[in-house]
Regions:
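Glycoside hydrolase catalytic-domain context in secreted enzymes
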Residues: 1-678, 684-701, 708, 715-718
């Protein structure tokens, strides 16, 4: 893929100098125009186009006028992390590549693949005139009910950081600024505008903030988007400690902080570190004003907003545009939709996780099987998540099923289905088989279909998305009962799940195989068919823990769920940094399926583990494919004990592709912060001196080898 801006990307010194030179020539009126963005015309939310957007402007998620006399381009942004979206306000848009959900890409454990997807998204964004992509979902999947988990990579800070950074790197390589979002603790959707997320500050640094810190260091995103929620009583967009002291102070972040749409409550958020109010009409809807328009100007006139702060806000925005070369664009680049589809297909293939297989898979493509396909809209397409990140694919959706709901996001809550359908692709993949389809609307009819066939593939979907959390982990619309009835009628049942989160699976012991397909994007049906028939060997690994029940989680009951829209909610994240697999290790609970779990049609063996210490841990080992098929594996290195303290941390991983009998040596070196505790009194990280135990594992609860190593005690970083 052509990197059109290699001469300017990363040229931070020249970007800083140019920003200073240009900013000095701006008028205050031009400066104020740069610190807001105007939500593009969306008929579902705003019936008329905002008059501040010039006629002929390509409508976008956010528009900020440029300053042509100084070479400053207009800023036009688009959602999001799974492709360039079109949420209802570009009727002539041809559609874009719909990549797999981020949690599916998280299951790939493949940074280079995520980078390729980011490059494609950046190029498609640029071809449409968007120079800011609202991508880089870096929140941690703390709660398996969070409706937006499909927009995030994982529950682990390190895995999330590495993958989010590569998406940002890919996007920005195309001359498009990328965000990293949502800073921070935007981990539940229930009444998110009124949610106060409470957490111990040191634990926050070791988990959610560490994910952002590592991702920023690895990718230098042009913008950080704040969340809707409060953190310890202060709104994310006006949290001076997090924005000024941590992000811009301790970490030295040089880019700009934008609010989420409708998340700026007051002009004084500018004093607390917010540089741009995004989607100003959203603030008018929620709070009855646009704080960075009249209020900010008045504060400046009254001397409450210092001149140097206004200059700093503008400098940060200019610097980010210039750093990627967004001011030097030539003609719109050509896009290669076939190549992008191939990237999306590879993401779906590597993101699908085989959770269980009692010999039912792969299906024999050359056998005259009678196969029942039941449920999950498998005759129409594969499911996608909802909200601002939903991508309108080239050629449009196979179907859009309205769901609705309370609150401002109710109108965009739909079941989106991408063509082609699993039914169509499985017919091609099983040319000797006779396929028998039932929609799965009633358990009795589904059971009759199951009984008259050799094997059953039952599909199940769940609608999840922005603005809503799930009440529990069950499947909607009676699908658990349907699967239970089908499995009772024909034990040779395979279940394919298209969801954005773990599910409860009360029928788990009654079926022969379970495939977690997530929301697999526009190429999902092909990937599912290839996995089921063995054309592709499954290699995905879970980036989120699947609990046996919500009783194993820190909050069996979700605070505020079911309360009216607009209700103030407080969530105490008392688990601190012990999220997901870390919580399971701390409590001794055994999950249904552990973080890192995933089966294959081949087998792998680990050997020759050697570990060295000092200031960090370096592990070397050999991975061998001991089976008869080529396949991908993801060996994982964990800290399990730190100088006598039981502590579970993913230290590293590497995806390896091996032919039968092939071996490869892997070396993993841990970021020292993963071995440390954050010491808030010293404002530094502290590694404890002494013996540390590390484990080489297939999953968080599946150790294959372990070793002890001595580490030097020391303070470092910030």
């Amino acid at each position: 893929m052509t990197h059109a801006t290699e001469d300017v990307v990363g040229a931070e010194g020249s970007a800083d100098e140019r920003a200073r030179q240009v900013e000095q020539q701006m008028t205050d009126e031009e400066r104020f125009s740069l610190v807001i963005s105007i939500f593009g015309w969306a008929p579902r939310m705003f019936p008329t186009k905002d008059p501040r957007i010039p006629d002929g402007t390509n409508m976008s998620a956010g528009y900020t006028p440029g300053v042509p006399r100084l070479g400053i381009p207009a800023i036009q942004s688009s959602d999001a992390s799974m492709g360039v979206t079109n949420p209802g306000y570009r009727p002539d848009d041809p559609g874009a590549t719909a990549f797999p959900s981020l949690i599916a890409l998280g299951s790939s454990f493949n940074p280079s693949l995520v980078r390729e997807g980011g490059e494609a998204i950046g190029r498609e964004a640029r071809s449409r005139g968007f120079n800011v992509q609202l991508a880089g979902g870096c929140n941690l999947a703390r709660d398996p009910r969070n409706g937006r988990n499909f927009e995030y990579y994982s529950e682990d800070p390190y895995l999330s950081a590495v993958l989010a950074a590569e998406q940002v790197n890919g996007i920005q390589s195309q001359g498009v600024t990328s965000t990293l979002k949502h800073f921070s603790l935007n981990c539940n959707e229930t009444n998110r505008h009124w949610l106060d997320a409470r957490i111990d500050p040191d634990a926050h640094r070791e988990a959610d903030l560490l994910a952002f810190q590592i991702a920023i260091e690895r990718s230098h995103p042009g913008a950080i988007m704040s969340g809707y929620n409060k953190i310890n009583g202060e709104y994310a967009g006006g949290n001076g400690h997090l924005l000024n002291d941590v992000l811009k102070g301790a970490w030295g972040y040089p880019g700009y902080v934008m609010s989420d749409w409708g998340a700026t409550l007051s002009w004084d958020f500018a004093l607390k570190g917010l540089d741009q109010e995004s989607g100003v009409q959203g603030d008018m809807v929620f709070w009855g004003k646009e704080p960075f328009t009249d209020d900010l100007r008045q504060a400046y006139a009254d001397g409450k907003l210092p001149e140097e702060r206004l200059h700093d806000m503008v400098l940060r925005i200019l610097r980010s545009l210039f750093a990627v070369g967004a001011d030097q664009w030539g003609p719109a680049p050509e896009v290669d939709l076939d190549r992008y589809h191939a990237i999306a297909l590879q993401g779906a293939r590597q993101g699908i996780v085989l959770l269980k297989n009692d010999g039912a898979l792969p299906l024999a493509a050359d056998q005259p099987l009678k196969v029942a396909l039941i449920g999950g809209f498998a005759q129409e397409g594969v499911a996608s998540g909802t909200g601002s990140g939903a991508v309108n694919p080239v050629g449009g959706f196979a179907d859009v099923v309205p769901i609705g709901g309370a609150g401002i996001m109710g109108g965009s809550r739909n079941l989106f289905l991408f063509r082609p359908s699993p039914l169509e692709l499985l017919k091609k993949a099983l040319p000797q088989a006779k396929l028998d389809f039932d929609p799965g609307y009633t358990p009795a009819e589904a059971a009759m279909t199951a009984k008259r066939n050799d094997v059953v593939v039952a599909f199940a979907v769940r609608v999840e998305g922005e603005g809503y959390d799930n009440a529990d982990l069950s499947l909607p619309w009676g699908q658990d009962a349907m699967i239970d009835a089908v499995a009772a009628a024909n034990p040779n049942t395979i279940v394919v799940l298209e969801t954005g989160n773990p599910t409860s699976m009360p029928w788990r012991d009654k079926v022969q195989a379970i495939v977690q397909a997530w929301y697999p994007g526009q190429a999902g049906a092909q990937a599912i068919a290839e996995i089921l028939t063995g054309a592709v060997n499954p290699s995905g690994r879970l980036p989120i823990t699947f609990p046996e029940s919500l009783d194993q989680t820190p909050r069996p009951q979700l605070p505020g769920h079911g309360t009216p829209w607009g209700t103030a909610v407080t969530i105490d994240y008392n688990e601190g940094a012990e999220i997901g697999y870390r919580w399971m290790a701390k409590t001794g609970a055994q999950p249904m399926y552990a973080f890192g779990h995933g089966l294959s049609y081949t087998s792998f063996e680990y050997s020759d583990l050697t570990v060295t210490g000092g200031e960090t841990v370096t592990a070397m080992f050999t991975v061998t494919n001991t089976g008869d098929r080529a396949g991908g594996d993801v060996p994982q290195l964990y800290l399990t004990d730190a100088a006598g303290e039981k502590r579970m941390r993913l230290l590293g991983f590497e995806r390896v592709e091996l032919e039968p009998g092939q071996s490869r040596q892997v070396t993993l070196t841990a970021d020292p912060r993963l071995l440390a505790r954050y010491d808030g009194t010293a404002s530094q990280w502290r590694v404890a001196a002494g013996t540390h135990r590390v484990a080489l594992a297939r999953a968080a609860n599946d150790e294959q080898a372990s070793a002890e190593v001595e580490l030097t005690g020391y303070l470092f970083g910030s």
